Amino acid sequence: HVYPEIDKAILNTYFAENGAPIHLDDIREFIPSVCSIEIPYVDNAIRHLAQQGVIQLKDENVYPLQLKKAEASACVLIKHEKGLPWLDIAKLINGNNYSRSPVYEDRLDHEAFNQPEYIYLSGKGTYKHTCFIDVDAALIDDIFLEMMEYAEKNSRPVFHLNEFYQASRNLKKHDYYVIRHFVKHFGEDYGFYFDGKSQTDSIGLEKGFKNITQKDVIVEAMN
């Protein structure tokens, strides 16, 4: 048998984007599309990955066994359009052995949710796969333009994300946590610096700003 050497992580992104299990035929089609392997050797390559403990073959299905924690979270979340609490995600990953190292179940495992192209915080302690965000790129520009206008009108160096959200009909068409995801990961391109520590969701117009709390906003409005 010829066992072609292929990158052990070759399927990781595929699982993160499509979930598990994946039908063997889809894997057969995918592998030659991302590496220079000759078609007759694809089955050998798949068998070799299974022998190395990278994947598990069951009937005609392929399951991952060596994903990074965040890839494993994405793999689970693709099947849950409404999102899941972090503990449920951890239990599903560990129960299915999708990850090369177990995800903490006694506390939030930040490493398991730190992959913004696939995962976003969708509520208090719950996460969703980004494939369920229904917003196109042009709309993201519009969202930030509105935020810029608001920041110019209210000349302060730091804002609370909720202020922008409540002040804009356009932003309110989208879920708060979707806007939060955009600001957190694309904001710096538009001059907004996000800090989500301690649930404040503060946004500064300069890097390294001091956080504001909801109380600061209310007190300022009273003066």
Q: How should each PLM-predicted stretch be described?
A:
Residues 1-223:
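C-terminal non-catalytic scaffold/interaction domains in large multidomain proteins
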